From Swiss-Prot:
Lineage: Archaea, Methanobacteriati, Methanobacteriota, Methanomada group, Methanococci
Record keywords, A-Z: Cell membrane, Lipid biosynthesis, Lipid metabolism, Magnesium, Membrane, Phospholipid biosynthesis, Phospholipid metabolism, Transferase, Transmembrane, Transmembrane helix
Family, similarity comment: Belongs to the CDP-archaeol synthase family.
Transmembrane stretches, start-end: 3-23, 56-76, 91-111, 136-156
Any one Pfam family match given in the protein's UniProt record, by short name: CarS-like
Necessary cofactors: Mg(2+)
UniProt entry tagged with the keyword Transferase: yes
Location relative to the cell: Cell membrane
Keyword Lipid biosynthesis found: yes
GO molecular function: CDP-2,3-bis-(O-geranylgeranyl)-sn-glycerol synthase activity
Entries under NCBIfam families matching the protein: PRK04032.1 (NF003114)
Enzyme Commission identifier(s): 2.7.7.67
Protein name as it appears in the record: CDP-archaeol synthase
GO cellular component: plasma membrane
């Protein structure tokens, strides 16, 4: 497969997870999913950065992304292409990817708290990779990918994540650039 097509296919597949992971930065806030509770080690379970509102809107916008992808395929691509999962397929896939991404983000926050890292402190790769790993784990049993696509996503996702965080920081949507 041509490298450019592989790159496009990988990003197209994972796009609902990327959107779901980005939206809470903009539309989050409110009650944290851990209700402000501490783990037995005395540190927060997850922290204030992961909220019900952010999680809800992350999943919602992930699903909306999947629905838009469906209509883009119908209107602008070959309906017989590998990208055509059908509307229900896109809704299910985008829900799985978005939910997996946000679960991975929560797990990453939980792990950071165990290492006594506060919200906003950098944890290289943990911040950039857990959301993508869990998005893939949630979706893979129903919508499997070839191994070369998975490897590509694991390589490019930290770069895309870092780039988008820098943009969000410059737009004053994030307090730190990482």
């Amino acid at each position: 497969m041509d490298l450019l097509l592989l790159l496009f296919s990988a990003i197209w597949y994972i796009l609902p997870a990327y959107i779901a992971n980005a939206v809470p930065c903009i539309l989050g806030g409110g009650r944290p999913v851990d209700f402000g509770k501490n783990f037995f080690d005395g540190y927060r379970l997850i922290g204030n950065g992961v909220t019900y509102r952010g999680t809800f809107f992350g999943i919602l916008f992930g699903i909306i992304t999947g629905i838009l992808q469906h209509f883009i395929v119908i209107l602008y691509m070959d309906p017989e292409s590998a990208f055509n999962y059908g509307l229900s397929g896109y809704i299910i896939l985008s829900f799985l990817l978005a939910t997996g991404a946000l679960f991975g983000d929560m797990l990453g926050s939980f792990i950071k708290r165990r290492f006594k890292l506060n919200q906003g402190q950098s944890a290289p790769l943990l911040d950039q990779i857990t959301f993508i790993v869990f998005a893939l784990l949630f979706a893979y049993p129903f919508y499997p990918l070839p191994i070369n696509t998975i490897i590509l996503l694991l390589v490019i996702s930290p770069l895309i994540h870092l780039s988008s965080n820098i943009v969000a920081y410059k737009l004053h949507l994030k307090k730190v650039w990482w």
